[in-house]
């Protein structure tokens, strides 16, 4: 099965872009997908949007720091964290947008002493959990609360000062209509020629197929029982978002995994989309614009 997005209104080079092949559904999975039914009412959708921050804050209140496992795979999966250096011990400045309670942040800081990190999250409670972590060192990490769809990152991060932006399982939690605002925001702090590393839920992931009727908000967009939302990406949709934000696609691939529960005899096919995008270089004559820079990391 190949997912194809219409190319109307897109640059010619993008319209000709070959789509990746999505996971092929079984007959039972297709039946389950058809059972998702009608969309959630506009009234409830607007309420979910208004209460998005509250719902994520309640999520972290319930689960504290226990829900997600530490992501020790980030440096292994994204070779760009090594490749973007000109020499081995070069210091890197990264931004983790949507850091949660630090499951990706702290393993990276532990593994690489030459990283300084900015990190932000929608949830004030998640930010406090990061600051309370024994591994939190203000000399190596600056964490702050931020709604990436409306709060200006330049209030916290100097313009064009970041070598790598991590977008790991965060964009899916944002309404698709507001995703372009997030990308415009992060591009302001990313250096020209540097990259965004993305990983998130892919089309037909097991989590998507598990939703029941009354959960569908839009195409590939769903709400969980706790009010948090999740979008399931195609590579074409993601490439269009970044292209329209002025970035160039470097690499995109679907990552297919299987979660096995031997005790229950269950096998769950997982689908993630992993991609890299680059902010184009610009002429040396045009300097960065923005706020007065903060003191840089030492």
Name the predicted role of every residue range.
Residues 1-54, 58:
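N-terminal auxiliary segments of SAM/dcSAM-dependent transferases
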Residues 67-92, 103, 107:
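Conserved alpha-helix/loop element of class I SAM-dependent methyltransferases that forms part
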Residues 88-154:
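Class I SAM-dependent methyltransferase SAM/SAH-binding core
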Residues 153-165:
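A short acidic, Gly/Pro-enriched loop at the edge of an enzyme's catalytic core
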Residues 162-178:
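A short SAM/SAH-binding and catalytic strip from SAM-dependent methyltransferases
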Residues 180-195:
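A short glycine-rich, Lys/Arg-flanked "PGG" loop and its adjoining helix->strand segment in the class I
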Residues 202-264:
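C-terminal alpha-helical "lid/dimerization" subdomain adjacent to the S-adenosyl-L-methionine
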Residues 258-298:
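Core SAM-dependent methyltransferase catalytic element
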């Amino acid at each position: 099965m190949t997912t194809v997005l219409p190319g109307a209104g897109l640059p010619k080079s993008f319209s000709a872009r070959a789509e990746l092949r999505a996971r092929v559904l079984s007959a039972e999975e297709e039946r389950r997908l058809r059972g998702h039914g009608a969309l959630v009412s506009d009234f409830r959708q607007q309420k979910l949007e208004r209460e998005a921050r509250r719902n994520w804050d309640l999520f972290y209140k319930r689960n504290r720091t226990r829900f997600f496992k530490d992501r020790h795979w980030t440096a292994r999966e994204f070779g760009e964290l090594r490749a973007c250096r000109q020499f081995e011990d070069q210091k890197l400045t990264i931004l983790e947008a949507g850091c949660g309670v630090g499951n990706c942040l702290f393993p990276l800081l532990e593994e690489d002493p030459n990283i300084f990190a900015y990190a932000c999250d929608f949830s004030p409670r998640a930010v406090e959990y990061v600051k309370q972590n024994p591994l939190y060192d203000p000399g190596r990490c600056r964490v702050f609360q931020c709604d990436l769809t409306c709060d200006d990152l330049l209030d916290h991060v100097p313009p064009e000062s970041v070598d790598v932006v991590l977008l790991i399982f965060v964009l899916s939690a944002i309404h698709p209509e507001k995703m372009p605002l997030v990308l415009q925001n992060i591009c302001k702090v990313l250096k020209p020629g540097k990259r965004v590393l993305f990983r998130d839920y892919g089309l037909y992931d097991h989590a998507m197929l598990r939703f029941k009727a009354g959960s569908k908000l839009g195409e590939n967009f769903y709400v969980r029982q706790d009010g948090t939302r999740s979008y399931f990406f195609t590579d074409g949709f993601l490439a269009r978002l970044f292209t329209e934000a002025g970035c160039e696609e470097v690499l995109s691939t679907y990552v297919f995994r299987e979660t096995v529960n031997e005790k229950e005899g269950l096998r769950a096919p997982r689908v993630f989309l992993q991609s890299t995008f680059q902010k184009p270089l610009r002429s040396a004559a045009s300097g960065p614009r923005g706020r007065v820079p903060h003191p840089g990391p030492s």
